[in-house]
């Protein structure tokens, strides 16, 4: 009999979503969120100022497994999620206290009305990453594996719920993780990018410390990374037959494998973003949103 060195507490997002879909009136509001996307009456008269993620270009053009827009279909529920991973000291951050770090993996359904996105009763606590130290990049993949497995089922063929609030005879539901929001170190770990101290310090473009450095602000000359390039670099790292090959693949791109790349729609170049509050607290001024 084997005992785990570190037990990982995981909560099934399918069970959680089933409970949310049973709440009176909530399912209809979740379906209505797609009214802001391409082809809808709202999108034709939309103002330039965006009010919700559904106003953004990515979800306006996001396609499902059938190659068509992922928006609401009458016979299926199509929902998108924000993934967050954060580490904290459960013993509180005291000046003379112990340095302990425990992580949480959580989901927010972006189809919920914005005013309830972050209410505890409407957030999904997926897992608790055990301490006592913050998890390394390659180890965090093991904690993401069951979540990715569940969302592969959600993507195709979808998950059949026997009954929901609006569909007494059941309904197929498809879901996708379209946004990863963490502080900068956790965002890079989760998506497979190395820390900003690496030679390839940028997750958006191909700038390096040796050539452009940190002071080059002529962004018109920066070459943006593409989804295909990042995926090829991550696969080269994953399929390497030795540590030396992995080191070469990593050194040339600054990218390692992330479990999220098993999701066929996941795009490292636009799905991952540092949490806004950390940027503001760190006095980081953003002059252009990419």
Named regions from a protein language model:
Residues 1-51, 55, 152, 156-290:
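Domain-level detector for long, ordered catalytic/regulatory cores in large eukaryotic signaling
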Residues 6, 125-138, 187:
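Short interface patches used for recognition in eukaryotic signaling and trafficking proteins
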Residues 56-71, 149, 180:
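A short, flexible low-complexity segment enriched in Lys/Arg and Gly/Pro that occurs
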Residues 61, 67, 73-133:
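Acidic, metal-ligating active-site segments
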Residues 75, 79, 130, 134-145, ...:
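Intrinsic disorder
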Residues 94-99, 120-122, 138-142, 190-192, ...:
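Short coil/turn segments at secondary-structure boundaries
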């Amino acid at each position: 009999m084997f005992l785990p060195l570190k037990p990982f507490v995981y909560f099934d997002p399918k069970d959680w979503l089933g409970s949310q879909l049973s709440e009176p009136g909530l399912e209809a509001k979740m379906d209505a969120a797609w009214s802001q996307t391409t082809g809808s009456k709202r999108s034709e008269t939309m103002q330039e100022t965006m009010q919700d993620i559904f106003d953004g270009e990515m979800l306006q053009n996001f396609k499902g497994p059938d190659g068509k827009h992922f928006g609401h279909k009458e016979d299926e529920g199509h929902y998108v999620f924000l993934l967050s991973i954060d580490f904290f000291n459960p013993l509180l951050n005291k000046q003379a206290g112990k340095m302990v770090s425990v992580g949480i993996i959580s989901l927010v359904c972006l189809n919920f009305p914005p005013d309830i996105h972050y209410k505890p009763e409407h957030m999904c606590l997926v897992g608790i990453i055990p301490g006592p130290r913050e998890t390394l990049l390659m180890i965090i993949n093991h904690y993401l594996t069951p979540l990715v497995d569940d969302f592969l089922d959600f993507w195709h063929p979808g998950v059949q719920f026997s009954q929901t609030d609006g569909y007494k005879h059941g309904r197929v539901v498809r879901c996708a993780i379209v946004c990863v929001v963490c502080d900068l170190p956790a965002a890079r770990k989760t998506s497979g990018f190395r820390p900003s101290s690496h030679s390839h310090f940028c997750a958006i473009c191909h700038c390096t410390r040796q050539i452009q450095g940190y002071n080059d602000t002529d962004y018109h000359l920066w070459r943006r990374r593409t989804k295909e390039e990042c995926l090829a670099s991550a696969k080269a790292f994953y399929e390497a037959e030795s540590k030396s090959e992995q080191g070469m693949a990593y050194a040339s791109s600054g990218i390692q494998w992330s479990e999220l790349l098993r999701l066929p729609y996941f795009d490292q170049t636009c799905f991952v973003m540092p949490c806004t509050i950390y940027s503001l607290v760190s006095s980081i001024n953003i002059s252009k949103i990419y």
